[in-house]
Amino acid sequence: MDSGKIFEKLLHLAVGRGITVRFCPFQASEGRLRGNRLGIAQDLNIDKINYNLAHEIAHSFLHYDKGNMIESPKREEYEEQADRAANMILEIIKTAFR
């Protein structure tokens, strides 16, 4: 499946969860989820956009009740969990929608 189609599926998943996705001029990060708003850095290539979108969607499933994760002492653990889940989300999309 091409990267554009993967993006469409990820966007559909985000919107289905009530998340608004925007491209933003981030300098310190590639993606950020705050409540139901998800920002992706606007200068990324499509594969990085897809990965970061999947990563932030993963946070919405895994850590919706954890408050401010950036300042959490468990931040590294949460990031590793979201990384693993993002890879699973991408693999599911690639295999389920061939």
Model regions: which residues?
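Active-site hotspot residues in diverse enzymes, especially metal/ion-binding acidic/histidine motifs
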Residues: 1-98
